[in-house]
Amino acid sequence: MSFASETKKELTHMDVSDSDAKVELAAFIRMNGAISFSNQLVIMDVQTENAAIARRMYQLLKDLYEVPIELLVRRKMKLKKNNVYIVRLKSGTRGILEDLRILEPPMTFTKSIDRGFVKKRSAKRAYLRGAFLASGSVNNPETSSYHLEIFSVYEEHNEAICALMNQFDLNARTLERKNGFITYLKEAEKITEFLSIIGATSALLHFEDVRIMRDMRNSVNRLVNCETANLNKTINAAVRQIDNIKYIQSTVGLEALPERLREIAALRIANEDVTLKELGEMLTTGQVSKSGINHRLRKLDQIAERLRSGETPSQVGLKVSNS
């Protein structure tokens, strides 16, 4: 079962007050309900491929309204042959839809969210929970980028969902898709806050555990990459230094160097693998700091480059014996 399915399954076990149950139903029916007319009856079908969600919608309707309710199961014949669960109302439909603020007399459907219906904070949470159960999804934090979204056919309703989410400072954004619109979250912290808002505590804890482990792994990888880069930089510098010292040795000889450069040059080519700190501790003339050693090696680099460019030893400041 996917992380999104596990999250929705958890939500279907939540106990809610009658007022919050109505708000949750309103969100779900507005997004997943369909109306048809037969023999002067207004028939409403609420459809989902999730059995646990179908049972919840059936139970909420049964607890709130004293009307006959059917629960049907059909099998999809295209693509994935999943079961489709249909909660069907054949009587009292108009009154229920008006009570849920989905329908206004005489027969006008509302595409947005009734502000008075979600005035309380618990009602806002309930509406977002119903919307997520209806058409929400959240990526598995273990295997992909952080992403949570809720799909809506109508732009007006999508904007209302986004505004509702942002009343909780979630930094939600909207985007148009091929067949509708989505409100989405990309920040891991905001996704955990949303899971808390809708009541998915277990999913939240799992998400946080995975996020912490991912952040730790990323930190370790960054540290290793940084250390590897620094090591490569050190190795490349040592190779360059030794190459330059050997060039000086083969052209004018190390004897032409000033004493403080001559000693470090000899130590460097004799101890290719040691650090600058260790080189500083090897000097017979007294220990020199790492920065001091680095300064002398840079001077040797400059001398080698000037000799390579055609300057004479005297121009570089070296004294070459004529004997």
Curated annotation (Swiss-Prot):
Similarity comment: family membership: Belongs to the WhiA family.
Pfam family, one: HTH_WhiA
DNA-binding region: 275-309
UniProt name for this protein: Probable cell division protein WhiA
Main function: Involved in cell division and chromosome segregation.
GO molecular function: DNA binding
GO biological process, one term: regulation of sporulation
Keyword terms, alphabetized: Cell cycle, Cell division, DNA-binding
Tree of life domain: Bacteria
PANTHER family on file: CELL DIVISION PROTEIN WHIA-RELATED
Keyword Protein biosynthesis appears in the UniProt entry: no
